[in-house]
Amino acid sequence: NVDTANAMLLLSRLYLNSPKSFFSFLNNLVEDIDIDVELKVVLQEKNKSSVPDAAIMQESFKIAVETKLHNNFAEKQLLHHLASLEGYNYKFLMTLDPREMESNLKQKIDSECKNKNVIHINLTFKKLIEAVKEVVDDRDIDMQNIIADYERYCYDSDLIPDDWKRMRVVLSGTSFESNKANNLYS
């Protein structure tokens, strides 16, 4: 899926540019939970039988991503994705679509995720872009250009709805003169 690949390219570029920004992005998406998955370097860490000079460690985490274009998420498929997250300390299911997930399905998925200690992150492509912009410095021209390119791709591919730009107009047949007289067209 090209749309998933491009979204993951954006996130991988964010990580390569600044792991700290990537982890801030992740933390911002799950406001109520403090996620500590950044790389840690510890000197002289004591354990039961030894004290190594240093340790480099990182908590295990996995983000399973499912992208749809017409909000046609299948509950069964999403629940099967949860199995792929077993064994990780921090588990995320990211659902990505041009529109918000239907509320009944979101409640079911959120409930199942909670039971399995998985964090469900439901995003639109627009919200994904906004969340990335939030953690990237305005002076970081390279990342700003990457975000702008991705945003342009999303608009060109109809991943960000622009129906708010349209107005439904009912044509006036017999009432045109009356509408004009009442200044409806000014």
Residue ranges of model-derived segments:
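Charged, terminal alpha-helix-loop-beta segments
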Residues: 1-186
